[in-house]
C-alpha cells in the first residue's frame, strides 16, 4: 500500500514538473513538402526535395547564397551512383522547369553547390503563398533518361 502511494506521488510530481504553469506546446505539423522523390538513370540515383524558403535558416541561406528575403520554394537535387558515391558533374545532364499553377512551366536555372565533397544542385522559384508549385526534372545519362514531377503547396 505504501509502495502504491509513493509511486502515485512520484508520478504526480513528475507530471507537475512538466507543466510549469503553461499550456503544452502543440507539435509542429510535418512538412510534407520536404518529401523526397527518387528516380534512376542507369546506375545513377537522382533525389529531389522541395523546401519552403521560410524554413531555411539564415546561416545555411548565406552559405549557399539563397535569397530568403522573398517567399518561394527551393528545389534540391542530389545525384549519386547506386552505392551513394558522388557522380562527376558532367556525367549527367539535368533540366528543370517550374511553374506556379495554373501558369505554364518555365525553365529554371540550376546552380551547383558543393556539400561534403559532392555536387548537388538547387533551383529557386519565388512566389507568394498560398500557391501550388509544380516542378519537372529531366535527367539524361548515356542515352538513358528519367523524369521526376512533383507538386508542392506553399502555405502561409
Model-derived regions: residue spans:
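Beta-strand-rich domain onsets/edges
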Residues: 23-74
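Short, solvent-exposed, Trp/other aromatic-anchored flexible loops in extracytoplasmic proteins
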Residues: 109-136
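Edge beta-strands of extracellular beta-sandwich domains
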Residues: 146-154
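Bacterial Sec-type N-terminal signal peptides, specifically the leucine/valine-rich hydrophobic h-region
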Residues: 12-15
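Short flexible loop/turn segments that cap and initiate beta-strands
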Residues: 82-96, 103-107
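Bacterial N-terminal signal peptides that target proteins for export
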Residues: 1-6
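Beta-strand-rich structural segments
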Residues: 72-83
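Bacterial signal peptide processing site
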Residues: 18-22
Amino acid at each position: 500500500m505504501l509502495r502504491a502511494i509513493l509511486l502515485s506521488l512520484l508520478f504526480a510530481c513528475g507530471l507537475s514538473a512538466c507543466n510549469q504553469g503553461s499550456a503544452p506546446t502543440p507539435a509542429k505539423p510535418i512538412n510534407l513538402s520536404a518529401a523526397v522523390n527518387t528516380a534512376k538513370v542507369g546506375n545513377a540515383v537522382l533525389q529531389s526535395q522541395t523546401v519552403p524558403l521560410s524554413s531555411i535558416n539564415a546561416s545555411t541561406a548565406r552559405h549557399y547564397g539563397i535569397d530568403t528575403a522573398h517567399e518561394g520554394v527551393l528545389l534540391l537535387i542530389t545525384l549519386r551512383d547506386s552505392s551513394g558515391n558522388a557522380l562527376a558533374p558532367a556525367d549527367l545532364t539535368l533540366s528543370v522547369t517550374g511553374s506556379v499553377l495554373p501558369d505554364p512551366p518555365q525553365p529554371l536555372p540550376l546552380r551547383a553547390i558543393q556539400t561534403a565533397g559532392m555536387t548537388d544542385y538547387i533551383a529557386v522559384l519565388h512566389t507568394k503563398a498560398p500557391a501550388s508549385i509544380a516542378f519537372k526534372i529531366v535527367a539524361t545519362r548515356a542515352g538513358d533518361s528519367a523524369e521526376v514531377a512533383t507538386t508542392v503547396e506553399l502555405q502561409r
